[in-house]
Amino acid sequence: MTTIEPPPAEQIKKDIAQIQQWLTATPHLPSVEDEDWLETIHRNCKFRLEKTKSKLDAYFSLKGKHPAILRDRDPLAPALVTARSAVTLAVAEQLTTDGSLLVYHIHQPDHSLLNAADYYKRIVMLHDVILLERLAPNGVLFIVDFTHFRYQHFLKIMMHVRALVEILVSCYAEKIKAAYLITESELVVQMIKLITKLSPQKMRERVKLHGTSMSKMPREVDEEVLSNDLGGKGPSLAHSEEKTQQLLEKYRDWFLEQDRICENLAKRSKKELKESFKKLEID
């Protein structure tokens, strides 16, 4: 991946001040005092002012459009605790040799525990924490295990999936290096085809189907970082999942505060509403 040389520190500071002024001057958007958070988003947007503004607009605006995923985000809420048992969602504690962050999604056998909105809510919360902690300096690499995925999972997972894609593409700008999907199920393959149709072409090109044999995974990722549950030498998935939950809980107050920060639709023009989110882009 080509390294983006950041502008001089003074220029970044001016950019952040301009973004804050823009937020304050835009009637339907809230003011934001957290300069570090804004700088991280700006960095992920490769220091492009207009792209940063677009991501921020979507970030606050989509809360009203998709409240099932973007509101009531208490990591200790009973529903989100149950979601931990449905899908093991975890980040590796160590970066790969090229500075990428491994993010695991391991679907568990008991489909009765799965609620798509709660699972997607935790995904988006994790993306926020990745931003806040600056965990992915060189992008994100997903490993999604569908070994236990069945038709009952499929029926649930497709609920809200269009909303999730819109949120991730419109609001977040982490570099997605690749998504390894562990499966030998034709059902999963067809589901992925449906989902990727909603995604930009660049994202589709980064989806890699991987069989259930883990023999090649350490060579394709980073053996030292990859979980020992998947053939690597890194910590167990259970250990990484617990650490990830602790990270989410660390920002519990922040998540609760964010519930009160969203756009004011009454102050947004009808033309803006009509033209918003027509174009989805990904780096």
Predicted regions and their residues:
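Basic, amphipathic alpha-helical/coil surface patches used to engage anionic, phosphate-bearing ligands
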Residues: 1-283
